[in-house]
């Protein structure tokens, strides 16, 4: 499966993205701007305090790692770290 298709599948099934978020992420993804698409997704997840499950986090990290393997794609880890922080904060609140 191509990276573009894998990211689009993630975008399409994400319950956390609004229609405009989907449109923007799809636009970046279709242009081959995979890192930008994933950074946009991470920004939305963190800004909306979305606590991802371990499976959701693993899928997101897998896409990011695949993107990083492409020489000219630079993903800023600060975006993923923000999602992890939110997920850890909110998952610990709900598990108490």
Feature names for model-found ranges:
Residues 1-96:
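C-terminal-biased regions
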């Amino acid at each position: 499966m191509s990276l573009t298709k894998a990211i689009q599948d993630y975008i399409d099934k994400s319950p956390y993205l609004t229609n405009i978020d989907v449109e923007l992420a799809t636009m970046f993804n279709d242009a081959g701007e995979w890192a930008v698409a994933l950074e946009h997704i991470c920004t939305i997840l963190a800004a909306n305090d979305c606590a991802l499950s371990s499976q959701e986090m693993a899928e997101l990290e897998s896409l990011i790692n695949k993107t990083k393997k492409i020489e000219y794609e630079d993903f800023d880890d600060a975006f993923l770290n923000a999602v992890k922080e939110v997920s850890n904060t909110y998952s610990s609140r709900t598990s108490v």
